[in-house]
Regions:
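DUTPase catalytic domain/fold
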Residues: 1-207
Length: 207
């Protein structure tokens, strides 16, 4: 595999192999595309711990914030604000997503993957190794985040980058069998997409 450079990323956006909806020109870097934090986050209820320092936010979460249940799991659903931050504290497990719909189309032989920005990591944000995409996957990317120290989160924060590798052979289209995308039409995907789509789905590849 080899990473696409800036010129190759641009070329593949132009020819339709790379989907980069919502991406501004300045987000396209030498070997990747920068992505920003989406409007909503989901916090696993059992990962919320009492904190004297963030006592008011703790009370707000417990008594005011919207709760949802999905497949037997409880979440707080929080709308992020660009001006007023939400404090993610150590121990929290948060599902977030990118503002951008981004990835590759089936038949392109291009594999998209996500990496945390180094600045995000230095702020104390942690992201596990669940950033590998597949050929044909494009969507708003789910971000599974934990935190080493208290971190301010705002809608639109620069959080990570998507890079692209070439794949040898003829891989199948992710939309044909993937757990988190079954639509290969961008317009339809955007029209039907909702934040709850990032919550854990039915795993299809269990033996």
């Amino acid at each position: 595999m080899s990473h696409l450079s800036y010129s190759e990323i641009l070329k593949n956006i132009e020819n339709g192999n790379i989907i980069a909806d919502g991406v501004k020109p300045e987000q396209i870097k030498d070997q990747s595309i920068d992505v920003n934090l989406g409007r909503y986050i989901f916090i696993r209820e059992e990962s919320v711990k009492f904190s004297f320092k963030f006592f008011k936010q703790y009370l707000w979460l417990i008594f005011v914030a919207k709760r949802i249940e999905f497949k037997g799991l409880e979440y707080f659903m929080i709308e992020l604000n660009h001006n007023k931050p939400f404090w993610a504290i150590p121990g929290m497990f948060i599902l977030a997503y990118t503002n951008e719909f981004i990835g590759t189309v089936g038949g392109s032989n291009l594999q998209p993957s996500f990496k945390l920005k180094s600045t995000s990591a230095r702020r104390g944000i942690q992201h596990p190794l669940a950033g590998l995409g597949e050929v044909g996957f494009f969507n708003r990317w789910c971000l599974e985040l934990t935190f080493a120290v208290p971190v301010e989160l705002r809608h639109g924060d620069l959080v990570g980058q998507i890079y692209f590798d070439t794949v040898i052979g003829k891989p199948s289209d992710y939309a044909d069998k993937g757990s988190y995308q079954s639509i290969s039409d961008l317009k339809k995907l955007k029209a039907e997409w909702q934040p709850e789509d990032i919550l854990p789905g039915n795993i299809k590849n269990v033996l």
